[in-house]
Design a protein with these regions (language model features):
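Membrane-embedded alpha-helical segments and adjacent helix-loop junctions characteristic
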Residues: 64-151, 287-358
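Helix-loop-helix junctions within the multi-pass membrane cores of secondary transporters/permeases
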Residues: 205, 331-334, 338, 345, ...
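Alpha-helical transmembrane segments of multi-pass membrane proteins predominantly involved
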Residues: 126, 131-138, 182-185, 360, ...
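Helix-loop-helix module between adjacent transmembrane segments
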Residues: 85-86, 106, 118-128, 159-168, ...
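Membrane-core helix-loop-helix motifs of multi-pass transport proteins
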Residues: 142, 146-214, 220-225, 359-362, ...
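Hydrophobic transmembrane alpha-helices of multi-pass small-molecule transporters
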Residues: 1-86, 195-201, 205-308, 402-420
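Interfacial segments of multi-pass membrane proteins
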Residues: 54-57, 179-186, 270, 274, ...
Length: 420
């Protein structure tokens, strides 16, 4: 064993506190892998929260140190865009856009392409999870009414939302984290990410057009439309939300105003409403995701203090494997993202990346890897859950038949683009 790796291990043997920290870290990331802990009614957010509490409880960190471990700009940016997305959802924007696209008199391949484009574009500005939450019921009803293969359209929707969200530093939580921690410039990232994302959406469409030739595994004829009441389209509130979102994009692209501050101001403007009560808007904020971030920040910071993570990175470097290089980062990023999901994977890898180029690669890889497995992205699970309520069952095998080739294609496109 190399001296670099042996030293931290000797420290752990001599200090039970550090051994306990490592044990807490292992249990927390086991929970990230399993989606909870066996025999306990805990999801990933609950596991992360209890991990943070345990770290403070054993005296590894004071409450003040735990608070400093949380990257507040990321939390504030996440919260602010949850408010913006809530405004758009309450205004019926997502449902109305999807309904209008579904009503277009297009042949099946072109309709599929239109839905992929819309889902990808919306996810680049708003949360991919929210986009899937709003679009899935409409797309499911479209498939039932037109007798289209729902697996192709719904898995395509999830993949498009994931791919599209990689285009900007506000498209998904892990990109917000990477952009905030590494201080990536919004416009610079956009110009680097837009080509592989655009080509990735095109590759997704091409593969789905090919995949739809196979016989459908769902008997669409036996399905009936579930007429639930979507939000009523409110032009004024939608215009208000779009105006704030557009203003924020301009600020991000052309000014140096901190993104989290600008986003908070935008969220504050939206909360000044005579139509939507603030408590109603806050009800659409994903508090569990914020808790997940806070808990993982604390647990990861405690683990970093043991020196094990730095020693592991040094050991890899001594064997010619550098995390900053695209090859190892792609392999480790894809593997971790599908083991523990993309947000925890990003939080593990991010402290060891020092260059903007590595940050861009991680943002793209961790997001695109979410299409591989059904559990690789929350957006995938949202689509499957809402489809089930319409009587459409999508299992992990059906997802993998589309997700595997799409992930391989999009990662290959990204690798070629970044290596140019």
């Amino acid at each position: 064993m190399s001296p670099e790796l042996a030293a931290p291990l000797l420290v752990i043997e001599a200090h039970p506190l550090q051994t306990t920290i490592v044990a807490i870290f292992a249990v927390v990331y086991l929970g990230m892998f399993l989606g909870g802990l066996p025999k306990l009614k805990l999801d990933r957010s609950g596991v992360a929260l209890l991990g943070g509490i345990a770290v403070v409880g054993i005296g590894a960190m004071t409450t003040e140190e735990a608070a400093r471990a949380v990257h507040l700009p990321t939390i504030l940016l996440l919260f602010a865009f949850m408010v913006v997305s809530a405004q758009m959802r309450l205004g019926g924007f997502y449902t109305e856009v999807t309904r209008r696209v579904a009503a277009l008199p297009l042949a099946e391949p072109w309709l599929l392409g239109a839905l992929i484009f819309v889902a990808g574009a919306l996810s680049a500005v708003f949360s991919n999870d929210i986009v899937c939450l709003a679009m899935t019921p409409v797309v499911a009803r479209l498939c039932i009414e037109r007798r289209l293969d729902p697996v192709v359209f719904l898995v395509g929707l999830a993949c498009a939302a994931n791919i599209g969200s990689a285009a900007t530093l506000i498209g998904n939580p892990q990109n917000m984290l990477i952009g905030s921690v590494l201080q990536l410039h919004f416009a610079d990232y956009l110009w680097q990410a837009l080509p592989p994302v655009g080509l990735g959406l095109l590759a997704l469409w091409a593969w789905l057009v090919f995949a739809r030739r196979r016989p459908s595994t769902v008997n669409v004829e036996a399905l009936t439309v579930d007429r639930e009441n979507p939000p009523i389209f409110d032009r004024l509130q939608t215009a208000k939300g779009l105006a704030v979102a557009a203003a924020l994009l301009v600020v991000f692209l052309f000014t140096d105003w901190p993104r989290e501050v600008a986003a908070l101001v935008g969220a504050g403007v939206l909360l000044l409403s005579r139509r939507f009560h603030s408590s109603h808007v806050m009800g659409f904020v994903d508090w569990e995701l914020l808790v997940l971030f806070v808990g993982l920040f604390v647990v990861n910071h405690a683990f970093e203090s043991t020196g094990l993570a730095a020693a592991a990175v040094a050991w890899l470097a001594a064997h010619g494997i550098h995390l900053g290089d695209s090859g190892p980062l792609f392999a480790i990023g894809v593997g971790l993202s599908n083991l523990v999901s993309n947000v925890p994977a990003t939080m593990l890898l991010l402290p060891h990346l020092k260059t903007p180029e590595a940050g861009v690669a991680l943002a793209l890889v961790s997001t695109l890897a979410g299409n591989l497995l059904l559990v690789g992205s929350i957006a995938n699970l949202i689509v499957v859950d809402l489809a089930r309520k319409q009587g459409i069952a999508i299992d992990w095998r059906q997802h993998l038949r589309i997700g595997l080739p799409v992930t391989a294609l999009t990662l290959a496109i990204t690798a070629l683009w970044l290596a140019r």
